[in-house]
Amino acid sequence: MVNTQNQISQTSDLDYIVNQPYKYGFTTSVESEQFPRGISREVVKLISKKKNEPEYLLNFRLKAYEKWTKMKNPKWAHLKHPNIDFNSIIYYAVPKLKKELNSLDEVDPEILDTFNKLGISLNEQKRLSNVAVDAVFDSVSIATTFKKELAEAGVIFCSISEAIRNYPDLIQKYLGTVVPSGDNYFAALNSAVFSDGSFCYIPPDTVCPLELSTYFRINNEESGQFERTLIVADRGSKVSYLEGCTAPQYDTNQLHAAIVELIALDDAEIKYSTVQNWYAGNKDGKGGIYNFVTKRGLCSGKNSKISWTQVETGSAITWKYPGCILAGDNSQGEFYSVALTNNYQEADTGTKMIHIGNNTKSKIISKGISAGKSKNSYRGLVKIGPQSFNSRNYSQCDSLLIGQSSQANTFPYIQVQNPTAKVEHEASTSKISEDQIFYFLQRGINLEESVSLMISGFCKDVFNELPMEFAVEADRLLSLKLEGTVG
């Protein structure tokens, strides 16, 4: 008989697989232009001047900065990390480029090579034919593909800097309407210093002909990344948006504080998918990205729908709660999430579903996986307002523990203010057992593959919601991160 306990707990198995090298940890050597370290009113003005922004946007930034200086860094999350020295960060760092890039031939070959190594070809002839990409490197958008094809359908997809110049009416109308500049500490910081990001507008009665995607890459060790994404789906339109990210392997920590605003008008649908693979630090907890992100969608129109799907495997610290405000009657919000922590990673993530309109529906499927000495917390809010009649919510929060030293926590908050509402909440915590492993081993399946199969089964409800390319990548990513963590 196989001694299952010995095989599961072998240190060599654990070390071999838990500490697989982070293959995106390389750095790119490029000449860059950057501001001195530190944040001040003058730095905020410099960012706005550098980007030649209109006065209303400068005022937006300055008001956000004033709010930020009066706010305190939130301490309520189930996270423990050193205080962030905001004056040690460079808030603007861009590779030296021409002011206007007319073709990829004018982009530094080192940068193009970086995205090729990441599997993100910016050459349209070599790209997947159904995906348009906006590539962001440190503080600037490098290139956006298939803009011509999208424009023929009336779809606007470009960097937010370009949108500020070319579509000022749309930016002024929608920017900051879902995530106000003073929404929270990190949203205020982003609103003051954001330098680039993506903008997407889908015109009425249009199904976007391509998947839209943005890939974020932090390269500079001393800079933070503060991108801003704004997606507007006009009445009767539909769009699917993909987001990916990586960073070099440094012993220090870098700050990523982003904002994503989604707006769905009458009968519109937005599907937003993320595979987050920032550098998570080494096996001793040294280095890694501090990921403090505000993501929110507004279903402002009747019959509108916003769906968030995320796979979180990276970052030393993750603080992130994508949510939906269901203001339109019959609107729907969905949240599908897999959050993996390993070694000394810490994640406090979840969602908020705010029901305002009548007959609104929300669905939450959260899968948390904790390994090593990590902490993984789900924090969710379901709120049904007094005027939201016949609204429904279903929440399912499952945690899986791997090893003896990891933690899983769930902090659900449910507030129902209307007697016609129906709310269901399920939660479970489980562990990969010896019996399960033994079952696989007896059928000739090795330990690593056994763990991988069980993880895939645990996460399938979320993976099924991802676009096919992302689902395959997410499954492979979890297998790589979790192999051999049973102990």
Curated annotation (Swiss-Prot):
Pfam family, one: SUFBD_core
SUPFAM superfamilies: Stabilizer of iron transporter SufD (SSF101960)
GO biological process: iron-sulfur cluster assembly
Sorted UniProt keywords: Chloroplast, Plastid
One GO CC term, this protein: chloroplast
InterPro entries for the chain: Fe-S_cluster_assembly_SufBD, SUF_FeS_clus_asmbl_SufB, SUF_FeS_clus_asmbl_SufBD_core, SUF_FeS_clus_asmbl_SufBD_sf, SufBD_N
Cell compartments where the protein resides: Plastid, Chloroplast
Main location: plastid
The family this protein is said to belong to: Belongs to the iron-sulfur cluster assembly SufBD family.
Name the record gives this protein: Iron-sulfur cluster assembly SufBD family protein ycf24
